[in-house]
A protein has these predicted regions:
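Bacterial N-terminal signal peptides that target proteins for export
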Residues: 1-14
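Sec/Tat signal peptide C-region and signal peptidase I cleavage site
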Residues: 19-23
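Small-residue-enriched, tightly packed secondary-structure blocks
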Residues: 28-201
Length: 201
């Protein structure tokens, strides 16, 4: 179901060294030094996210690395991400609809839809490509819930903006591109569903 159609029908979303040599020529401990920190088998490194984002956003992705590093420095390395598109617009009260695919390393991929009201000044009826970083997701179906937070321009760099939403220790960080005049942060939520729906509540 096309995002713009849903929007219209709805009325117009983170080297430990091993040790010093012992005194008088005693051999060092047998335990080897730990390797440098890197992504675990189930999480994505910053470089993996940036590469996926460059392919997705294209020419406007020059500022993506800065936003990804900001997100990783605060929440660590995500164990999933969503690529999709959305539309929305608000002047005091508005709606947001989107659809895309949730990607994970070891739990498969899953189609997702999202919708939700926004309350505040986020004016412009924007249409946006959206990448969402997903943290602490225990299983793919756990994405289907409401995530509340500050759904607006928490960080804006160039043609991209980043926000954050959370529920039950799961954090979703949307990174959006698109058109529309954003006049400030608005408060709302995004509800992820298995199927497209007109109802954002």
């Amino acid at each position: 179901m096309h995002v713009l159609g849903r929007l219209m029908m709805g009325g117009v979303l983170m080297l430990v060294g091993a040790g010093s040599a012992l005194a008088q020529g005693t051999p060092p401990p047998a335990n080897p030094a730990a390797p440098p920190a890197q992504a675990s088998p189930s999480t994505y490194s910053s470089s993996e996210i940036v590469v996926a984002g460059h392919r997705f956003f294209g020419a406007i992705s020059r500022d993506l690395a800065q936003l990804v590093e900001r997100a990783v420095s605060r929440w660590g390395q995500p164990n999933g991400y969503i690529l999709g598109q959305e539309g929305g617009g608000a002047f005091v009260v508005g709606l947001r609809y989107g659809d895309g695919t949730l990607y994970t390393k070891n739990a498969g991929d899953r189609r997702v839809f999202w919708e939700g009201p926004s309350i505040g000044f986020d004016y412009g009826g924007d249409g946006a490509r959206t990448m969402m970083l997903v943290y602490n997701l225990p299983r793919t179906e756990a994405i289907y819930r409401r995530f509340a937070g500050v759904d607006g321009s928490a960080y804006v760099i160039g043609g991209l903006d980043m926000t954050a939403l959370t529920d039950s220790n799961i954090v979703v960080v949307p990174i959006r591109s698109g058109v529309g005049l954003r006049l400030g942060a608005n408060i709302g939520y995004l509800k992820f569903t298995e199927r497209a729906t007109w109802n954002p509540f």
